[in-house]
């Protein structure tokens, strides 16, 4: 199954050099904390529409492969994050199979729970970088995060109804 927003997410082109962004845009794109929590601070009820979830091979990765360890299998989760039922963000998480051991096995059992609710309660979470991307008028970002030093890649596309615009 796919979703048009996830097609746009996969089409993001990332800036080699961080662009100069006006404060409202940079406040959203460079946020270090949970996007779920930020949406809830807007007074919205946040829900997840799960689009894809399961293992994929390395050949299914795009330029993501260069940002993750070389492994035969990766856990993929693609979602739409809704605020009061309106789609605000498309998200794609890719985690190498080796990341999914110990407490990080919970990444496979999130179901309708936003990823941020899990990630940002972990004291072992670190972020290596945030890359800013764009597809036509839509902005997005990609981060390599680590849980207990184990990597995962999170890509987010801000949809037209989100407060970023």
From Swiss-Prot:
<feature type="binding site">
    <location>
        <position position="35"/>
    </location>
    <ligand>
        <name>substrate</name>
    </ligand>
</feature>
<keyword id="KW-0963">Cytoplasm</keyword>
<comment type="function">
    <text>Removes the pyruvyl group from chorismate, with concomitant aromatization of the ring, to provide 4-hydroxybenzoate (4HB) for the ubiquinone pathway.</text>
</comment>
<dbReference type="GO" id="GO:0042866">
    <property type="term" value="P:pyruvate biosynthetic process"/>
</dbReference>
<comment type="similarity">
    <text>Belongs to the UbiC family.</text>
</comment>
<feature type="binding site">
    <location>
        <position position="115"/>
    </location>
    <ligand>
        <name>substrate</name>
    </ligand>
</feature>
<keyword id="KW-0456">Lyase</keyword>
<comment type="subunit">
    <text>Monomer.</text>
</comment>
<dbReference type="GO" id="GO:0005829">
    <property type="term" value="C:cytosol"/>
</dbReference>
<dbReference type="GO" id="GO:0006744">
    <property type="term" value="P:ubiquinone biosynthetic process"/>
</dbReference>
<feature type="binding site">
    <location>
        <position position="77"/>
    </location>
    <ligand>
        <name>substrate</name>
    </ligand>
</feature>
<feature type="binding site">
    <location>
        <position position="156"/>
    </location>
    <ligand>
        <name>substrate</name>
    </ligand>
</feature>
<protein>
    <recommendedName>
        <fullName>Chorismate pyruvate-lyase</fullName>
        <ecNumber>4.1.3.40</ecNumber>
    </recommendedName>
</protein>
<comment type="pathway">
    <text>Cofactor biosynthesis; ubiquinone biosynthesis.</text>
</comment>
<dbReference type="Pfam" id="PF04345">
    <property type="entry name" value="Chor_lyase"/>
</dbReference>
<dbReference type="InterPro" id="IPR028978">
    <property type="entry name" value="Chorismate_lyase_/UTRA_dom_sf"/>
</dbReference>
<dbReference type="GO" id="GO:0008813">
    <property type="term" value="F:chorismate lyase activity"/>
</dbReference>
<keyword id="KW-0670">Pyruvate</keyword>
<keyword id="KW-0831">Ubiquinone biosynthesis</keyword>
<dbReference type="InterPro" id="IPR007440">
    <property type="entry name" value="Chorismate--pyruvate_lyase"/>
</dbReference>
């Amino acid at each position: 199954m796919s979703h048009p927003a996830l097609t746009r997410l996969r089409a993001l082109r990332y800036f080699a050099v961080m662009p100069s962004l006006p404060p409202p845009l940079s406040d959203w794109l460079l946020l270090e904390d949970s996007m779920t929590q930020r949406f809830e601070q807007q007074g919205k009820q946040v829900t997840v529409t799960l689009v894809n979830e399961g293992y994929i091979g390395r050949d299914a990765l795009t330029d993501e492969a260069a940002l993750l360890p070389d492994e035969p299998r990766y856990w993929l989760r693609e979602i739409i994050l809704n605020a009061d039922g309106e789609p605000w963000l498309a998200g794609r998480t890719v985690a190498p199979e080796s990341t999914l051991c110990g407490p990080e096995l919970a990444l496979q059992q999130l179901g309708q729970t936003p990823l941020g609710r899990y990630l940002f309660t972990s004291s072992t979470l670190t972020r290596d970088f945030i890359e800013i991307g764009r597809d036509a008028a839509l902005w997005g970002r990609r981060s390599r995060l680590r849980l207990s030093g184990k990597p995962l890649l999170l890509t987010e596309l801000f949809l037209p109804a989100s407060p970023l615009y």
